[in-house]
Amino acid sequence: MKTEYRLAEALKNMMSEVPLDSISVTTLTKKCKVNRQTFYYHFHDIYDLLTLIFLNEEIPELDEVQNVNDTLVYIYKYYLKNKGFIDATLNSAGKELAEEFIYNVCYKTFLR
């Protein structure tokens, strides 16, 4: 698995237990067993990694979503599946990233 994705998965898992603002690059890299320089080779900071997570979230079902109701159901199911991660993001300085992700999912549906 690529280092970026290992770091992303570790961050998502950690955010289910610890607030994002309490997670340091050092703690994250120790969990992934990579050094800090490796993290900074790929990312500027934790929020840069968080951006990658939201940009790369798999949403294959979205291509099949045809209306607003289906979009809302999709968002709800996504939230249930990723509750710890989403709640931690919404209660942190990364709140705007989660809001933008939800906005983009809705926007793509409304353009159809």
Predicted features along the sequence, with ranges:
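Basic, helix-initiating cap at the start of DNA-binding domains
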Residues: 1-18, 27
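DNA major-groove recognition helix of helix-turn-helix
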Residues: 7, 11, 43, 50, ...
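Append "Primarily bacterial transcriptional regulators
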Residues: 7, 26-31, 39, 79
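Amphipathic alpha-helical linker/stalk segments
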Residues: 16, 23, 53-75, 86-87
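HTH DNA-binding helix-turn interface
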Residues: 16-20, 33-50
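Phosphate-binding site recognition
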Residues: 25, 36, 60, 80-83, ...
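A short secondary-structure junction motif
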Residues: 53-57, 82, 86, 105-112
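Amphipathic alpha-helical packing segments from all-alpha helical-bundle domains
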Residues: 70, 74-77, 95-112
